[in-house]
Amino acid sequence: SGILVLSFSSQAQELKEDYMTWPESSKLGQYVSSWVPGEDLFEDENFYVSRVKPKERFRNAATQIDETLTEANDRKLVFWVPVGNASNGNTNARPNGKFDSEAFSTWSYVTHYGDWTAPHGWVPGGFADVAHKNGVGVSGVASVPWGGISSEWSSGFSTLVGIEAEKVAKFLHYHGVDGLGYNSEFSTGSSFILSGLRALHETVHKYLTEKGNPVVENFWYDGTNDNGQITFDSGLGNHNNDTFGDGEHIRTSLFLNYNWHGVLGGLTQSTVDTYAPGRSSLDLYAGFNMQGGDPSTWRTLKDYNLSIGLWGAHDYNMLWADRANNGSTDVAKQTYYQHLIEQFFTNGNRNPIDKIEVYNRGNHHPDDKWFGMSAFMTARSSLKWDLSEEPFISYFNLGNGRFLNWMGERQNDNEWYNIGVQDYLPTWRWWFASDFMGKTADKVVENGLEAKFTYDDAYVGGSCLRLFGSVDNEYLHLFKTEFALSAADVITVRYKLVGGQADVNLALSAKGDEQTILRESGFKVLTVADEADDEVWVEKTFKVSGSLAMLAGKEIAMVALHFENAENLDLYLGEFSITRGAMPTPAAPEIKIAKVLASHYKGVDGKVIFNMD
């Protein structure tokens, strides 16, 4: 099935609280108990079903900035925060007629997104879709208040653990939820609940893993211990190793409280080997409060092999809350939000090779001096699959807009938000260098080109990539990939030259010889002789045949653009794709439910639920 919320109006309407049902967080057990596969639990259930299987990420040290990071020491990162703002009905990541909605996009620096204001066991389907295509796991949160467990949650957990655990796992698998998350800072004397949750978590992890899910992970805030008491900041030991589980009985990953630095001896791999053999210290997440005020421990983290846990706040994402710091219009807020997340996850320079030394800081609001999460981890990629089964296409669409374009043609001028249609976006954001594959600070071009998303135009969707400035010679590394090419594959670059001039070539390299550009002379995208025309999308296609036949059989490891002789360049990039043959057209959808939600002087709001083969 598919789902859609529509707003046909001159000024789009925000998703109203009564337009779509939110499941109740404490009642997951009741939902699972009533669930019959193939039958709807409630009318809006389809809004919480993911249609995209989680993709598995791959490793290639040659296309990492820091080649010393391996599976054993490359930190994971859980972003345990709300999507948007929970006030005014908690629209979260559900489809919406409001452009100024949160379109998170720096997925390559996140391994799990715990949607803090999504219900326990549920995540909006579109949000799960875009996370899954990028190889990121998702979960909702059981937001149990601190202190003695309430009757509501005691009853809810009792119902949940009283159900066959495998049915819960099947429920999560069906809906595309990759684990269970808990704000576990409650106390309880119920061994039935505690032992039942441990058994449930083990079953969920085992079942989803056996179903081929590469991103399954349950998260437990390290407050409630094995005995139902609250013991923060005690490391891993006899008090919580059953909740954590060993390598043969994987149950949860632990999100450590913010004073984790005080028990470093209890967080080493040797400690993990003692209390949970077969697990990794990277399954322990050093907690950081995005609101600030926690101990400044970033330099300490550099010396310990722990993953990163980011929380904050209860009702809104702190990076989202800062988006109005550079202007109050919706376009200014959206543009600055993308700038902020690029700074936070890459670094203040938004270029991972222009590194900033890690220092201690309790304020986690990014700025030009922020060292970024790229100081601790690689940018990960899921861009590896059989092109005969699925083409690789990016229109650089963020999943929201002030208008909607399709193949360069304006469809309407209504605001919209649907993060589920967000495209694959550049991996490193933005790896500019004077040399192809240049990885050190001396390869940073002073006053070089700039890159950012623009909401002024789009080939498909509501945004595209804007590249602008002047430079003699510079490379922009776009995508970390591992696509095996075949004869007759077609590589497409689509652009609009808004102003200025440049020589631009596509620069590709192959796995095993990543430093060598493959026949750059055969990939001319733009020349200084081309005239600017801000009305025309120009398509350049390159077929794996003739002079480019030597690409057949090679696995493309790097996709980059090479700029030379750029003067006042203003270039919109609307598509990069690699396709193999013609993809079949999907069957027309079968409308299941179509209803008007509201009619008002601004237009009509509606909801459509449909089935597709």
Predicted features along the sequence, with ranges:
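Extracellular ligand-binding interfaces
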Residues: 8, 494-545
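Substrate-binding cleft of secreted/luminal carbohydrate-active enzymes
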Residues: 14-53, 284-443
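Chitinase-like catalytic core of GlcNAc-active glycosidases
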Residues: 69-267
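Substrate-binding surface in catalytic domains of secreted glycosidases
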Residues: 183-361
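Extra-cytoplasmic beta-strand recognition segments
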Residues: 429, 465, 475-504, 540-544, ...
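Short carbohydrate-recognition loop motifs
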Residues: 445-475, 530
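Conserved aromatic anchor
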Residues: 601-613
